[in-house]
Structures are given as structure tokens and as C-alpha cells.
């Protein structure tokens, strides 16, 4: 017999579907952490940016929450049945980015599709699609996957196809994430160690090659290693972020009391938000936040 709380949650999540939640397996830790991080994100965006960005952030969070409840209504088997369709959709959207004048160029890269006032990054769908596809493939083709090269290379081919299109944007970061996540799943699923080592070496060599063949990428690595050498140009953001961290010390200056966010640290609301968190809340809270993220990853 379901409790009143369980009946309420079932109606919210599944509507009229005859499906119940097994609360013994329900990961309340993950849900609690996710909700905390979502609300903390709102606080930091409010502290760093203008009202317009805060409103947009809250709206995007609401849209994401609706999508979460919608996706949660379906069994995992449903997503496994449409994994290839998701892959084809990802490939199609990534190809659209290559069509002239269809996608905006931002900071020298074409990564976003704008539609009806929304901005969407196809690489994010590609990550999710590949995650579902590789996981499903390792279950469906377990023996083939473990016993021969053919079974191993099928998901690798899909991965390389997606990465190739993402590199054309260019977006080396998303490509590296997709590569690492795919290999991690395959390793956990029991991929032959010789296959795993071979593809890892190829991937590492390609990653290094992509850095050295593109001058600005190589320069970024050098700047990252010693940002103070070019503190007024390439290393400006890094040195400013270090200043924010140092100003916050262990316990911070207080919520909303950051100085570096006042046009002294570019992209403070995106790439360097963690520096502002450490400035306002301190390095001690920063360590706690890192621990929370580690718990989320482990869960």
C-alpha cells in the first residue's frame, strides 16, 4: 500500500501511468545535491550579473525542470529503443552548424543554434545521445563487444563521427569530454584491455596534435602555465581570477561583496564564476563545494 507522499509523487511524475516509484532505490542524495546547486547557482548569478541575466537563468532552470519531469516519466528501455534516432538527430544538428549564415559565430566558433528566442548547443545533445547509445550497446551486444574488434569499433565509429563534427566548430573541450566519457563507459562495461589501450593512445596523440597544430591553442597552454608573463593580454583573466581567490582568503568577503565582478574580471558570470564564489564565500566553502560535486559524480 503506497503512502500519501508516494501517491502524490507518482501523480506528479507519471500522471495517469500505472507506474510506481521504488522509494528504496530512489536517490534522494542526488536530488538534494542537484536542488541545492540549482538554487545556489541562482544566488551567484544574482550576485554577479544584471537582473536580465538572472531572469534568463531562472527561466532556463524552469525549462530544465520541466524537461526533467518529462524525461523521468519514461522507462530507461524507452531511451534505449531510440538511441540511434538521438544519434542521427545530433549528427543532423551538428551539420546545420556548418551551413553558412544558419548559426551565429561567437568568439570565432559556431556552436549554437538559435530558435524562437532560445539558444541550443548541439554538442550537449551529442553528449547525452552518445552516453545512452554506448551504454545500451554495451548491454545489447555484450558478447560481441567483449570478444572481437568489430563489436568494439561500432560505438567508436559513432563517437568519432560526432567528435569530427564538433571539432569543426571548433570545440576541443566538448570533444575531449565525449572521448573520455565514452572510453570510461566501455572500460566499466568490460572492453578488452588491449582495445582500450589502443584507442586511448590514438585519442591522446590526436588531442596533443590538435593543440600543437593550432597556434592559439598552444598559446593558451603556455599562458595557463605562466599567466603572469602576459598578465595584461592573454593571461589577464587568469591573473584577475587569482586576485579574486586571494581577496576571498579562507572565509570570503561576504555575499555580494565581490569587487572583481565589477568589470574587472571578464566573463565572471560564466567561465570564472568559481573565482567569484571563492572571493565572496572563501576557499573553505570552495573546498566544500568541490566535495559536493565529487559526491554527485560518484553517485
Enumerate the language-model features and the residues they cover.
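Helix-loop-helix junctions and helix-breaking kinks within/between transmembrane helices
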Residues: 48, 52-55, 153-185, 213-218, ...
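Hydrophobic transmembrane alpha-helices of multi-pass, membrane-embedded glycosylation machinery
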Residues: 65, 175-186, 201-204, 221, ...
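Transmembrane alpha-helix boundary/anchor motif
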Residues: 66, 74, 133, 208, ...
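Hydrophobic, glycine- and aromatic-enriched re-entrant/interface helices and adjoining loop segments
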Residues: 104-112, 119, 195-288
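Hydrophobic transmembrane alpha-helices and their immediate junctions
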Residues: 284-299
Amino acid at each position: 500500500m503506497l503512502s500519501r507522499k508516494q501517491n502524490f509523487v507518482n501523480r506528479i511524475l507519471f500522471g495517469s501511468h500505472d507506474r510506481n516509484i521504488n522509494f528504496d532505490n530512489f536517490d534522494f542524495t542526488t536530488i538534494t545535491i542537484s536542488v541545492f546547486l540549482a538554487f545556489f547557482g541562482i544566488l551567484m548569478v544574482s550576485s554577479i550579473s544584471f537582473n536580465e541575466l538572472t531572469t534568463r537563468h531562472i527561466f532556463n532552470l524552469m525549462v530544465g525542470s520541466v524537461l526533467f519531469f518529462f524525461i523521468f516519466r519514461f522507462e530507461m528501455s524507452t531511451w534505449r529503443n531510440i538511441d540511434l534516432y538521438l544519434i542521427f538527430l545530433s549528427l543532423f544538428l551538428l551539420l546545420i552548424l556548418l551551413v553558412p549564415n544558419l548559426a551565429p559565430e561567437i568568439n570565432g566558433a559556431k556552436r549554437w543554434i538559435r530558435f524562437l528566442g532560445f539558444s541550443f548547443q548541439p554538442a550537449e545533445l551529442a553528449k547525452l545521445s552518445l552516453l545512452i547509445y554506448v551504454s545500451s550497446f554495451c548491454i545489447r551486444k555484450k558478447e560481441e563487444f567483449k570478444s572481437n574488434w568489430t563489436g568494439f569499433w561500432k560505438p567508436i565509429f559513432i563517437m568519432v563521427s560526432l567528435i569530427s563534427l564538433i571539432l569543426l566548430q571548433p570545440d576541443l573541450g566538448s570533444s575531449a569530454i565525449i572521448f573520455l566519457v565514452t572510453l570510461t563507459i566501455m572500460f566499466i562495461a568490460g572492453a578488452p584491455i588491449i582495445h582500450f589501450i589502443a584507442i586511448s593512445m590514438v585519442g591522446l596523440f590526436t588531442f596533443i596534435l590538435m593543440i600543437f597544430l593550432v597556434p592559439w591553442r598552444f598559446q593558451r597552454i603556455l599562458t595557463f602555465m605562466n599567466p603572469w608573463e602576459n598578465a595584461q593580454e592573454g593571461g589577464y583573466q587568469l591573473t584577475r581570477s587569482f586576485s579574486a581567490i586571494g581577496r576571498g582568503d579562507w572565509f570570503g568577503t561576504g555575499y555580494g561583496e565581490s569587487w572583481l565582478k565589477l568589470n574587472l574580471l571578464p566573463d565572471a558570470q560564466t567561465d570564472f564564476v568559481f573565482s567569484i564564489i571563492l572571493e565572496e564565500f572563501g576557499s573553505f566553502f570552495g573546498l566544500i563545494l568541490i566535495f559536493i560535486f565529487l559526491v554527485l559524480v560518484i553517485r
